Amino acid sequence: MIPKEKMRLDVKWATRQRLQYIEIMAWYAGVVARSDVARAFGLSDPAATKDLKLYSDLAPGNLVYNHSVFGFVPGEGFSAVFADLAPAAVLPVIAANLAVANGPYGATLIYGLATASLPLPARLPGQQTLAQITRAIHGRRKLRVGYRSLSSRDSPAARMIEPHTLVDTGLRWHVRAYNEESCDFRDFVLSRITAAECLDTPAESSVQYDDDWVEQVSLRLAPHSGLDAVRRESLLLDYGASGDLIEVNVRRALLGYVLQRLNIDTTPDHSMNPNAFQLMLLNRDEIEPFAGWAFR
């Protein structure tokens, strides 16, 4: 009999992609079904079943079939075999709606184009914590968390929340969730969640009741009046403006993060340094009620 380790190494990349997806779904969604695999890779149901069987053969005990959810759930001794389940690897994959992380190319530039990103400090939760959060989102269930807010010096407070969406602001990740204590929807920074437990209790709220998430408003921006005409014209070209105005449609819940990310002068008299704040907000009165914390 061929050792399982040898069989794992011999798996072709196309098949390995599907096995990685099975592993990521099982861990972070809490369940993976034949239909999930078929939909993600455009497979027939028999082909998806074959992949699930192969995974079970190569990683025995990792998946257990659960009749109540019509799919496979992580076994008690679940341990990743094909996928890197670290939050730093998985969250970008989830955000980009990709099926797999960490291709086989390593440092090889498969497009022949060098790229780089800013070396920002990691602001991520542990793998176990993130899995509880994502399972609650996927299963639309309540989530009990320990959360340390910036305003509290006390030990992390216990909260009951109902999460619906993961958000990447470019500087950090947070989860948008209904907070039972305050009876409203709020943002919870993932790195400040010290503990999390996905409960079997169904969530009572829904994203459709999160008005600030559902409703969008338009940010009306312009090159800063303190810049000379040449630089103002360059900025309009830079942002693809068709006239003298740059308009960005944003969910109300994300307005403050966009203002921060674009370094926009939100002062009433546009008094910020134009070299540091190259854009200014024109519809301050309309926007401030939804993102007052981001205003100067």
Regions found by a protein language model. Give the residues of each.
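Polybasic (Lys/Arg-rich)
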Residues: 214-296
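Short, compositionally biased low-complexity segments
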Residues: 27, 98-112, 226-236
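A generic structural signal for beta-strand entry/edge sites
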Residues: 69-71, 172, 245
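Conserved short hydrophobic interaction patches
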Residues: 55-58, 196, 261-265
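Bulky hydrophobic/aromatic content
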Residues: 74-148, 261, 268-281
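Core beta-strand-centered patch of the WYL/Sm-like small regulatory domain
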Residues: 112-230
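Short, basic/aromatic recognition patches that contact phosphate-bearing ligands
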Residues: 1-84, 221, 272-296
